[in-house]
A protein has these predicted regions:
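Conserved alpha/beta-domain cores
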Residues: 1-201
């Protein structure tokens, strides 16, 4: 949004700074979040788009997840009411390690491949000097995905994957399917290619 940068803090590393869930309960962002909640309520209640799902991004801890949900409730967005579902972006190692604790508060997760990869192996995906280390075949990264799918599904939580990797690699698609992923989300321009890849398995 034009002018938005005027209200952003100057951070050395914004990728792990004030982003995602940490904004939603902050006094510095509460009015903007209230507007976001009003827009969601309008879409669901007035326009009858009850299939609209709330997704909480970059949520670092279960206690933070609880706080965001409580803040949403003050703005009239209550999980389970009028079929409202709440999903979590699973893109931080803590989302995987504490999956059993997050799972009681949410209905689904979407594994964010790009952030989960860079935060698992400590690689800045925007750094040209170490970009070669950002490999989706990395064992730690694959284990994180496997752990996330297994634990969340054990707790009755739907698990999806979003990111470019399934579009670029048939092998990665097969890995996700073998791990019993529920859904794979891709950008519109990648949809046909991904469907073709899945059809080859």
């Amino acid at each position: 949004m034009i002018g938005g940068e005027l209200y952003e803090p100057d951070e050395e590393n914004p990728m792990i700074g004030w982003r995602g869930a940490s904004r939603y309960y902050s006094d510095d962002y509460k009015y903007a979040f209230e507007l976001e909640c009003e827009a969601i309520k309008y879409a669901r209640d007035v326009m009858k788009m009850t299939n609209v799902i709330v997704m909480i991004p970059f949520c670092r801890t279960p206690s933070e997840c609880k706080l965001v949900i409580e803040t949403m409730e003050t703005h009239g967005l209550i999980r389970g009411e009028n079929e409202l579902r709440i999903f979590l972006m699973c893109e931080i190692p803590s989302n995987v390690i504490e999956a059993d604790l997050f799972s009681h508060m949410i209905d689904g997760v979407s594994i964010g491949g790009n952030d989960l990869l860079q935060l698992t192996i400590g690689v800045d995906r925007d750094s040209e000097k170490i970009a070669y280390l950002s490999d989706d075949k990395n064992i730690s990264y694959r284990r994180m995905i496997s752990m996330a799918i297994k634990t969340y599904k054990e707790h009755g939580v739907k698990v999806g994957f979003c990111g470019q990797q399934p579009s670029d690699s048939i092998e990665f698609c097969k890995f996700l399917i073998d791990e019993n992923i529920d859904t794979i989300s891709v950008t519109p321009d990648s949809a046909l290619k991904t469907i073709q890849n899945l059809g080859k398995l």
